[in-house]
Amino acid sequence: MSTGRIIQITGPVVDVKFPSGQLPEINNALTVNQQGAADGAVDVKVTLEVALHLGNDTVRTVAMGSTDGLMRGTEVLDTGGPISVPVGEATLGRVFNVLGEEIDLQEPVAEGTRRDPIHREAPSFEELTTTTEILETGIKVVDLLAPYTKGGKIGLFGGAGVGKTVLIQELINNVALEHGGISVFAGVGERTREGNDLYHEMKDAGVITKTAMVFGQMNEPPGARMRVALTGLTMAEYFRDEQGADVLLFIDNIFRFTQAGSEVSALLGRMPSAVGYQPTLATEMGQLQERITSTKKGSVTSIQAIYVPADDYTDPAPATTFAHLDATTNLERKLTEQGIYPAVDPLASTSRALSPEIVGEEHYNVARGVQQTLQKYRELQDIIAILGMEELSEEDKLIVARARRIQFFLSQNFHVAEQFTGQPGSYVPVKETIQGFKDILAGKYDDLPEDAFRLVGRIEEVVEKAKQMA
């Protein structure tokens, strides 16, 4: 292993000079272990990742930890390979940082646990599966109107406090309980408090044993935030490739991955492109997203929370992410105000899988019927607000009545929210979801009160609730 010396430190970017002919490769991990001097200087231990070869036997690196206290002339060791992180069963129920070090104050991962490099090629064309398979979530509004596919990429849009985290927890819970699946959660540049809350809530809900968690939060240097998504993805890939599992990968928030790249880019000496983003934006995003896919062995399905800066969907960061998405789940604050949870907007959420070839004619027709009814109701709301319900034709009154029932029936109780609501959660199979909405559209339940449809699972529960209300 070759040894170099630090010649320049610019914030999170460090230049290192190596002896002639001993340059480390791009993406190699270098370690610095600076012993504190006698005058009270602290020990500094930091990992660097090679980003550029500058010539003159010098490399430019990005630090994965704080460079405070680092001095020029300090010795740097080339590890001979990329950052590698623990994978496999040992990671479940644990919390790691970008380097695969445990940060949950529990026992260290067992010696001899397999470690995989975080940089690797995406699966080749031959390895990819050619069939599109639907991932049943048990959440009615998702399964009916914007179904997720195995190995797909789903964008989760929503402001603060509309239920992104609860929806993520419920998906982790349902996949673990109904499909025996494994989840990996990557916290990228978000609040440490939220990560801490999520960990404890998942512990209480009993789903932590099926989940590995990786965090590089807001307070971390940009290098860590830029690479932590790859650490989580590497852990997920092991379960897909070695165990043939269907894995859920949650990334919260994918925008911070781009943001961290842009923070480092200028310091690396690259010319900024549009809106000050890095010129390599599309490449970096592609390298991450192309590894998230279904192979013949298993699948990695990713659900990515996406922050949209200033609600500008044309901003290069969200616009680049959109190109990779198969489905979007849009959370709407207006629905939370009406007490409809999950607050998924049934008209704004989309999925490529919602086509007769993939979901079948019946599912497609029911979903489109539901959307038509809700769209008509939305158009009639202005008239109702000005003139009142009495001015509507009989046909329109019927549409409004059914639309309200549909809107309420799209809500349901979640297992992970049982401790707040006191109501048992419900998992609704797709077939029952389709049948329920088909019957509502056909007018089978026009005589039941609207409130009977609120926060229930199957359509039979509506009938039961209506009897109790009578």
UniProtKB/Swiss-Prot annotation:
NCBIfam families, per the entry: atpD
Membrane topology, record value: Peripheral membrane protein
Organism encoding this protein: Shouchella clausii (strain KSM-K16)
Subunit structure: F-type ATPases have 2 components, CF(1) - the catalytic core - and CF(0) - the membrane proton channel. CF(1) has five subunits: alpha(3), beta(3), gamma(1), delta(1), epsilon(1). CF(0) has three main subunits: a(1), b(2) and c(9-12). The alpha and beta chains form an alternating ring which encloses part of the gamma chain. CF(1) is attached to CF(0) by a central stalk formed by the gamma and epsilon chains, while a peripheral stalk is formed by the delta and b chains.
UniProt subcellular location: Cell membrane
Enzyme type, top EC level: translocase
A GO term from the CC aspect: plasma membrane
Enzyme Commission designation: 7.1.2.2
Binding site for ATP: 158-165
Main function: Produces ATP from ADP in the presence of a proton gradient across the membrane. The catalytic sites are hosted primarily by the beta subunits.
Catalytic activity, as annotated: ATP + H2O + 4 H(+)(in) = ADP + phosphate + 5 H(+)(out)
Keywords: ATP synthesis, ATP-binding, Cell membrane, CF(1), Hydrogen ion transport, Ion transport, Membrane, Nucleotide-binding, Translocase, Transport
Family: Belongs to the ATPase alpha/beta chains family.
Database matches in Pfam families: ATP-synt_ab (PF00006), ATP-synt_ab_N (PF02874), ATP-synt_VA_C (PF22919)
Primary gene name: atpD
HAMAP family for the chain: ATP_synth_beta_bact
Protein name: ATP synthase subunit beta
UniProt xrefs under InterPro entries: AAA+_ATPase, ATP-synt_VA_C, ATP_synth_F1_bsu, ATPase_a/bsu_AS, ATPase_alpha/beta_chains, ATPase_F1/V1/A1_a/bsu_N, ATPase_F1/V1/A1_a/bsu_N_sf, ATPase_F1/V1/A1_a/bsu_nucl-bd
Gene Ontology MF annotations: ATP binding; ATP hydrolysis activity; proton-transporting ATP synthase activity, rotational mechanism
